[in-house]
Amino acid sequence: MLEFITEKVTCWEKLQQETKPIYIYGMGDGAMKIMSVFKKYGIKTSGIFASDDFVRGHYFEGFKVQKLSEVEEKEKDFAVVLAFAAGYEELVNRIKDIGRKHTLYVPDVPVIGTGLFDYDYCTEHAAELEEVYHLLADDLSKKVFSSILDFKISGDIKHLENITSTKLEIYRNIIKPNLNEHYVDLGAYNGDTIKELLEITRNKYVRIYAMEPDRKNFKKLTKYISEKDHIYAYNNAAWCIDTQLPFSSKSGRQSSLASMGTKYIESKSVDNMLDGKEATLIKMDVEGAEREALWGACQTLSLIHISEPTRRRGIS
């Protein structure tokens, strides 16, 4: 069982044995979760540093936030723990450069909930993981799947190097958008993915529906689409039914539905939003509500007749 998983030791266990000072790169929710796991494992945090643009002499969790250059002046050598997701190439290259100079750990912490992904988790869910692996039709898909599991366990980005595609490659070779898309963007943020899509299609589309629950993000979204036709924005969370749900608003990309949320947000299903209209491409970034969002799109998905010419239709 699980012969496709090669990593057994978690990055947390490696960090327990780390002899160099350990510095967390980044702030926010990711850093808070990592520090919580550090406390559980008895791992000492030596300090916090951030990208230069975010350093303004302030403190985070009792640590003065430093620049990387300041840490490098003070420490002969140290280990770096990445505390955020890198979404653009320049930042990815910066992180890789840090990894060439220092020992780099990229731990996997959950977007929602408190459980950690480790080999014990894999053994507990071995039957499901085996089923997914053997359902994959080609060797590349199997390699991607196994490499991601190894990365999540080990926190070693070497597992991602040979399976990572550029955004342009993904759009051109996998998503393959055409000029007649009925696009649904769930978790539209500030319209960044809509912008990417329109760059590929040269601003050609039929309709775009964008759903974003965070009010600040929604304001940015509506500003971006204000002069564009046939783009409809909804300040809602994607769900299986139309109702009210507790919501934790953190702006940026980390807002999410949460049982302990202090505010309530109106939710909406894709089926009710579209009201029988078609969708050719659906993007979901719904922070743990994927199952409910899919339930709420069942009618819409049932209307998609996948034939050879339209095989590219789907959900990303």
What is the meaning of each model-derived region?
Residues 1-45, 51-303, 307, 311:
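Phosphate/nucleotide-binding beta-alpha loop and adjacent structural elements of enzyme active sites
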